[in-house]
């Protein structure tokens, strides 16, 4: 049984897959978004204990999300190859939503670090404590020029750095690692489905090319078979005419037998056996009409 025969039609797995794409994973993503809002709020207010607790809860949501994506992946791997295109359209929206949510969560911290570094290098604003990768966005900064002109004032919300002696600093690093792993899982899952579809497309192209080659090859083999069949009586007649008599007849028939053996790949096993039987009958007749000619049986005995 081939690998594809062990798989099933998409319609059999569609209800289970849609449960993940429309209910389970969107629910996890909504919960993750709420954690992100709370994390930003607690860090801005410097409520470190609450922030630490929210990091832990968000990490649990990320782990649950990873688990659900893996379960959905197992279902998708059971879908037959000819349904992969439809499957891809079914899972792409939730996959993109998960990827965007993870990137947004991580980008929040990245933009904070980059902005504060820029402010530090320009020496135009108040410097926050030393930066680490475990930072998010919060307080408001104003440049001197912005304060002079309220119409052109821009606000950059940068969250304060989490003190290294707070548990929230360590819990954020753990959450950050979980988010990166989740992002990689979503990417790998997407690549898996896409690679399977590309493999199917490649196989179809090769099958179409092979079909054309087989058709052309069949035509050529047919022509070759006709030419060989037409040549057999001619070659047999020429040799038989030169030798003459019963021996000449045998020689001519032998040429036909050799040609048939060489052309067995074209004529097939059945055709070869048919010629062989005819040859045997002819030799038996010749042996009976020519007593001096040894038979095949006598040759074997000798």
UniProtKB/Swiss-Prot annotation:
The modification N-acetylserine is found at residue 2. It is a multi-pass membrane protein. The chain crosses the membrane at residues 229-249, 255-275. One of its GO terms (molecular function) is SNAP receptor activity. SMART domains: t_SNARE. One of its GO terms (biological process) is vesicle fusion. GO terms for cellular component: autolysosome membrane; autophagosome; autophagosome membrane; COPII-coated ER to Golgi transport vesicle; cytosol; endomembrane system; endoplasmic reticulum membrane; endoplasmic reticulum-Golgi intermediate compartment. The keyword Acyltransferase does not apply. Residues 229-275 are annotated as: Necessary and sufficient for localization to autophagosome. The modification Phosphoserine is found at residue 289. A motif (Endoplasmic reticulum retention signal) lies at residues 299-302. SNAREs, soluble N-ethylmaleimide-sensitive factor-attachment protein receptors, are essential proteins for fusion of cellular membranes. SNAREs localized on opposing membranes assemble to form a trans-SNARE complex, an extended, parallel four alpha-helical bundle that drives membrane fusion. STX17 is a SNARE of the autophagosome involved in autophagy through the direct control of autophagosome membrane fusion with the lysosome membrane. Forms a SNARE complex composed of VAMP8, SNAP29 and STX17 involved in fusion of autophagosome with lysosome. May interact with VTI1B. Probably interacts with BET1, SCFD1 and SEC22B. Interacts with PTPN2 and ABL1; involved in STX17 phosphorylation. Interacts with COPB1. Interacts with TMED9 and TMED10; the interaction is direct. Interacts with VAMP7. Interacts with RUBCNL/PACER; promoting targeting of RUBCNL/PACER to autophagosome. Interacts with VAMP8, SNAP29, VPS39 and VPS41; these interactions are increased in the absence of TMEM39A. Belongs to the syntaxin family. This is Syntaxin-17.
């Amino acid at each position: 049984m081939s690998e594809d025969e062990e798989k099933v039609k998409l319609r059999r797995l569609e209800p289970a897959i849609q449960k993940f794409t429309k209910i389970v994973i969107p629910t996890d993503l909504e919960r993750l978004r709420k954690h992100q809002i709370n994390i930003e709020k607690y860090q801005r207010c410097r409520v470190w204990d609450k922030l630490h607790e929210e990091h832990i809860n968000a990490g649990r949501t990320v782990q649950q999300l990873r688990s659900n994506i893996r379960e959905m992946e197992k279902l998708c791997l059971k879908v037959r190859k000819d349904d992969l295109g439809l499957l891809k359209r079914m899972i792409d929206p939730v996959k993109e939503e998960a990827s965007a949510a993870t990137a947004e969560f991580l980008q929040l911290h990245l933009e904070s670090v980059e902005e504060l570094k820029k402010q530090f290098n320009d020496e135009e604003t108040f410097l926050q404590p030393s930066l680490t990768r475990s930072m998010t966005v919060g307080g408001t900064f104003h440049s001197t020029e912005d304060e002079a002109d309220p119409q052109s004032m821009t606000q950059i919300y940068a969250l304060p750095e989490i003190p290294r002696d707070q548990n929230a600093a360590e819990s954020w690093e753990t959450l950050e690692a979980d988010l990166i792993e989740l992002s990689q899982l979503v990417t790998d899952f997407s690549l898996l489905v896409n690679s399977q579809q590309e493999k199917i497309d490649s196989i179809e192209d090769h099958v179409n090319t092979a079909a054309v080659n087989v058709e052309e090859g069949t035509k050529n083999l047919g022509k070759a078979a006709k030419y060989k069949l037409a040549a057999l009586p001619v070659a047999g007649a020429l040799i038989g005419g030169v030798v003459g008599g019963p021996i000449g007849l045998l020689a001519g028939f032998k040429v036909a037998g050799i040609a048939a053996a060489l052309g067995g790949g074209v004529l097939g096993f059945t055709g070869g056996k048919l010629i062989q039987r005819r040859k045997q009958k002819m030799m038996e007749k010749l042996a009976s009409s020519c007593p001096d000619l040894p038979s095949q049986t006598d040759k074997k005995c000798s």
